[in-house]
Every structure is written in C-alpha cells, then in structure tokens.
C-alpha cells in the first residue's frame, strides 16, 4: 500500500545497533519513506532485534492495530516475529514498497488484574513469588472448574504458544484458530489435591478467571509477555481473547509453520 510511507524504528540503543539503524534509515529515505521520531506518526513500525525486542516494540507503541509491524533480525537469522534479516535490505524494500502488501494478523489477549486492564501478544503468566504452593480457584465463564495448587499458570495466544508455553510442554497452536491456551506450572496432584494436570484450550468467546486464595501468597509475579507487573494483594485475574489484532507483513515463503520448523526442527 503506497500510503504507508512513515516509518518508525524501534531498537535497543547500542553503538552497533545505532550504526546499523543509521544505514537502514538512509536506505528508507532513498526509497521514498519518511523516518519519523515518534511512533504515533508512523504507519510502519520496524523492530530491530529478536522476538523480545518485537514484543517490547508492540507494547511500547500500545499494540496499534492501524499500522504494520515489521520485525528485522540482527544476528543473521530470522525469528518467529522477525521476518526479515538486517543484511537483506532488498527483500525489506521490495515487501514494504509493494502495491499489494499481504497482511498477517496476530491476536492479542485482554488481561484484567483487579480492574486494571492490559494486553499481551504472547502470554500472561502468574506465579508464586515465594517458596509456597500457589492456590487459585479457576473459573471458565461462570463455572468453577478447579482449585489449582502449584507454582502458577500460563495463558497464551496461538503465536505465544511457541514461547514460555512450549517450554512447559504446552501445545503449539495454529494462529488461524481463535483461542487461548491454559498451561499449568508444576501442579500439585496427589490423593488429597487434584487439578486437570494438562493444558487446555478455550475458544474465543470464553473467559478465564483466576481467583487468588489469600493465604499469604497474595503478592504473585505476573508476567505480561516479557515484562513483570508488580502489585500486592492480587485477588482476581481475568483473561480472554481480544477482538484486537496487530498486523505484520506476510511473506509467501514464511508461513507460521515454516517459522516453527525453522526455529525448532
């Protein structure tokens, strides 16, 4: 789309990255793009770095759904969110200059912690901050599903299923399926206490509610993608699939499952 000409570069400051981005900015201007200094002015936001930098870029620019996010890897290979390589500038220019840009949409999750709202691209995690079993009543919609005892839980988007969720044996979910995945962290299962003991998937119209049992473990660590949210006396966390999505450039040779194969196999 030719009206997308304002580009904002998001990256972690370092001498090496500053020099690399200086060259990218010059190249962008040579091809008719306008480099802007605030993300609110941009309709293309380029994240320079790995997947962690991409998550930061999306969060720091407020999960905009009216622009394109572009992930550019620095280290010579692509990542799950970084479709381009910083050394392959021809591919970047060709894709962003195209009259008919194909767009890939990634869903977000809405998270509410005691009435305070957040959004995540990968996952929200809630864990004990002390060496003590964490107890939560788990509700699916209005149904009391179980009382969880263990280290915590992860609730992930389909794209986030490849991250923290996968490292604790959660399933990788096709992002074309609108859902959230709930994965336990070290659940306590014995003759006295019982949880489901496996990940489970909820459809887009379901709401998950975690009610914290106030037994001295009411100061949990809540992870919002790769950021920690610190708060005391947490009573309730609600999670659902958001109606909002972010957009990235879709490449013909870089589908989600090609990325999964490239990353893990």
From Swiss-Prot:
Its EC number is 2.7.1.23. GO terms for biological process: NAD metabolic process; NADP biosynthetic process. HAMAP family: NAD_kinase. The lineage of its organism: Bacteria, Bacillati, Bacillota, Bacilli, Bacillales. Pfam families: NAD_kinase_C. InterPro entries: ATP-NAD_kinase_N, ATP-NAD_kinase_PpnK-typ_C, NAD/diacylglycerol_kinase_sf, NADK. This is NAD kinase 2. The active site is at residue 51. It comes from Bacillus licheniformis (strain ATCC 14580 / DSM 13 / JCM 2505 / CCUG 7422 / NBRC 12200 / NCIMB 9375 / NCTC 10341 / NRRL NRS-1264 / Gibson 46). Its cofactor is a divalent metal cation. Involved in the regulation of the intracellular balance of NAD and NADP, and is a key enzyme in the biosynthesis of NADP. Catalyzes specifically the phosphorylation on 2'-hydroxyl of the adenosine moiety of NAD to yield NADP. It is found in: Cytoplasm. The keyword ATP-binding applies. Belongs to the NAD kinase family. Keywords: ATP-binding, Cytoplasm, Kinase, NAD, NADP, Nucleotide-binding, Transferase. NAD(+) binds at residues 51-52, 122-123, 149, 151, 162-167, 186. Signal peptide: none annotated.
């Amino acid at each position: 789309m030719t009206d997308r000409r304002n580009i904002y570069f998001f990256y972690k400051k370092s001498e090496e990255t500053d020099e690399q981005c200086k060259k990218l900015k010059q190249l962008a201007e040579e091809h008719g793009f306008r480099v802007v200094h605030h993300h609110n002015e941009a309709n293309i936001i380029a994240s320079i770095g790995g997947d962690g930098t991409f998550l930061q870029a999306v969060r720091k620019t407020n999960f905009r759904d009216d622009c394109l996010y572009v992930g550019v890897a620095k280290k010579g290979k692509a990542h799950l969110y970084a479709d381009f390589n910083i050394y392959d500038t021809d591919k970047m220019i060709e894709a962003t200059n195209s009259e008919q840009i194909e767009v890939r949409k990634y869903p977000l999750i809405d998270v509410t912690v005691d009435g305070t709202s957040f959004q995540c691209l990968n996952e929200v995690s809630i864990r004990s901050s002390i060496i003590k079993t964490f107890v939560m009543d788990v509700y699916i919609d209005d149904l009391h599903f179980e009382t969880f005892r263990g280290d915590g839980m992860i609730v992930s988007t389909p794209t986030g299923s490849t991250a923290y969720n996968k490292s604790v044996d959660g399933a990788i979910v096709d992002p074309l399926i609108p859902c959230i995945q709930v994965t336990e962290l070290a659940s306590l299962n014995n003759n006295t206490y019982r949880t489901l003991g496996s990940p489970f998937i909820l459809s887009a119209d379901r709401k998950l509610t975690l009610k914290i049992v106030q037994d001295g473990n009411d100061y949990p660590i809540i992870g919002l993608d790769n950021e920690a949210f610190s708060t005391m006396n947490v009573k309730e966390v609600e999670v659902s699939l958001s109606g909002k999505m972010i957009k990235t450039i879709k490449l013909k040779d870089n589908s989600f499952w090609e990325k999964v194969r490239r990353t893990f196999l």
